[in-house]
Regions:
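Residues that define the loop-to-transmembrane-helix transition and helix capping
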Residues: 62-65, 106, 140-143, 172-173, ...
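Alpha-helical transmembrane segments of polytopic membrane transporters and translocases
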Residues: 36, 51-53, 65-82, 110-114, ...
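Interhelical loop/hinge segments that connect adjacent transmembrane helices in multipass membrane
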Residues: 4-48, 87, 91-103, 224-235
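Helix-terminus/linker motif at the lipid-water interface of multi-pass membrane proteins
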Residues: 42-76, 87, 91-94, 128-138, ...
Length: 267
């Protein structure tokens, strides 16, 4: 806040503001787009913060610490996505009116899906070998959560990639609607399962929330824009994902190494 005041007064920002130049039509159009983004941001805050809050309340700080450690690796994956998100949003907005829009978006989306899936699976496949080296043994329980959270973050990435169409359409209401729906699902699943499966409730609630949001946006976006992922890529991704689920928890290093090699070939 102090920084804001300093910038305003040092630059004399008020000299660049004139109420006479306000255009009500533009103001209304901008407000119509931006106001729904407030509940959207609130929904994202709920999704990100509710899990830790619920875990800390019902299971204590020790369990919350384990969950926080488990989120470290998915956060690295999300940071990778955040780097590309702005350029992808700009690309969709620029090419939204093109004649070959649908073909361009389908091909690009398929490539992005394969790239992020490969990155996600690569991290998961490395975990059996990397986790014991990087994380203290007293946080070993965090290992079981990482695969679930990584898959949740993969769906979060897909949600973000499809939401760019809403941005291009200036349809902030649907952005807010789908985000709030996911936030509600996240809290309900978390509260229902927290006393039954402990920390896993937070991981599964996040996965279910982002999976639900992805399905909703995928179906809705494709009503107006043909932006589907090629079926062979989907089938290959599902098979690799299921394979990693089977090998991640098996505690057999040989099997896990074979899974790592297969994942590397897929990537």
């Amino acid at each position: 806040l102090l920084t804001l005041f300093y910038l305003v007064f040092s630059s004399k920002a008020w000299e660049y503001i004139s109420l006479n130049l306000i255009q009500l039509k533009v103001f209304k159009r901008v407000s119509t787009y931006s106001i729904p983004l407030v509940p959207n941001n609130l929904a994202w805050w709920i999704i990100n913060a509710s899990d830790r809050t619920i875990v800390a309340h019902f299971l204590g700080t020790a369990a919350n610490g384990i969950y926080s450690i488990a989120n470290k690796f998915p956060n690295v994956f999300i940071n990778f996505y955040d780097i590309l998100n702005l350029s992808w949003t700009e690309t969709v907005s620029l090419h939204y009116g093109d004649e070959d829009r649908d073909e361009f978006l389908t091909e690009t989306m398929t490539s992005l899906f394969k790239m992020f899936s490969a990155a996600c699976f690569g991290i998961v496949a490395c975990m059996p070998f990397v986790f014991p080296i990087m994380i203290n043994a007293k946080y070993a329980a965090a290992y079981d959560q990482i695969l679930i959270l990584m898959y949740a973050m993969l769906f979060r990435v897909l949600v973000g990639l499809y939401s760019c169409v809403y941005v291009a359409q200036k349809n902030a209401k649907k952005i807010a609607y789908t985000s709030m729906s996911a936030a509600i699902i996240n809290i309900i699943v978390d509260l229902v399962l927290i006393n039954k499966i402990q920390v896993f409730a937070a991981s599964f609630s996040t996965l279910i929330a982002f999976l639900s949001m992805f399905i909703i946006r995928y179906i809705d976006v494709n009503k107006t824009v043909h932006m589907k992922i090629r079926k062979p890529i989907i089938i290959g991704t599902v098979l690799i994902g299921l394979m990693l689920v089977g090998t991640y928890y098996c505690e057999n290093k040989t099997v896990q190494f074979v899974a790592f090699c297969i994942t590397a070939i897929y990537a």
